[in-house]
Amino acid sequence: MKKKMLSVLLAAAMTMSLIGCGSTADTATDTTETTDATETTDTADEATDASDASTDATDASADSDKTYTVGICQLVQHEALDAATEGFKTALTDKLGDKVTFDEQNAAGDAPTCSTICTTFVTNDYDLILGNATAALQAAVAATDTIPVLGTSITDYGTALGVDDWTGTTGKNISGTTDLAPLDGQADCIAELFPDAKNVGILYCSSEPNSIYQSTTIKGYLEEKGYTVTEYTFSDSNDVAAVTQSACDNSDLIYIPTDNTAASCTEAINNVADPAGVPIFTGEEGIAKGCGVATLSINYYDLGYKTGEMAYDILVNGADISTMEVQSAPNFTKEYIKDRADKLGITVPDGYTEITAE
């Protein structure tokens, strides 16, 4: 009986042992399967991360390989506009090297040609357009409302764009730089250089809105100082000499604003004013070199360079041109032509930098 009982107990013990072994084996199997699943998930995550990194690298490579084409429409060839264009190109080339190319076109002073040039730029789907001078900017603005348009050598954007209550931004695909020198400062220069003069003639092209704006503004400043001011306007280069002669006949001195037609005709103006002995104060350096005695001027190369920096910010950094404020020239310089000042008997006070006539 005792032997039977012992046999039963041994059998029960063996059964429990087998059950325990089976449970351990199942647990081991489950653990192995869980480990395999975890490893598979980790591997998949690593593969996804690697894929994302590869995509990012490809995108970065694509960005670094991107090239840009910029159209430049310049109204006319003269020193100031040439310098602005050169500064603009240099700024972009400094930052982008051979990743930027320029299609540079000159309209030879013809506004309709500006329109043709800018329409071609738009047809070619260029990345950005520079309008150098008011007529060029106006043509670019008329040609596109999607491609970014920057202006340079623009005196007053409100006048150029027909915007009332100008605030400094356009809210559109347009911004740029202004070459407007302080007209009150120019009036001050005239007063210190020509204290005995009474009659001032303002000589400019009637078809240039920026010149009209400057003439109207500085006329007020000069009249406040006691000068009698008369405007003498020409419609194009054909009547520059005749109008200049009229101005010289009736003026003690002549003021010429930043006027593109005048800038292109300085030799013709000088050929009349020099024999007449009438001094000319100008709104910018290039005109002063050609026919003037003094100026309060900006540096047009620097102005163009600043415009190029704005272009880079738009093209590469994604700046919103519609909210970019129009930028002004950083510095203004009093300059004079010594030979002309001496010939006319003008005493130039300290603070003026000597420049060479052309």
Predicted regions and their residues:
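Beta-alpha junction/loop-to-helix N-cap segments that form part of ligand/metal-binding clefts
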Residues: 104-165, 259-283
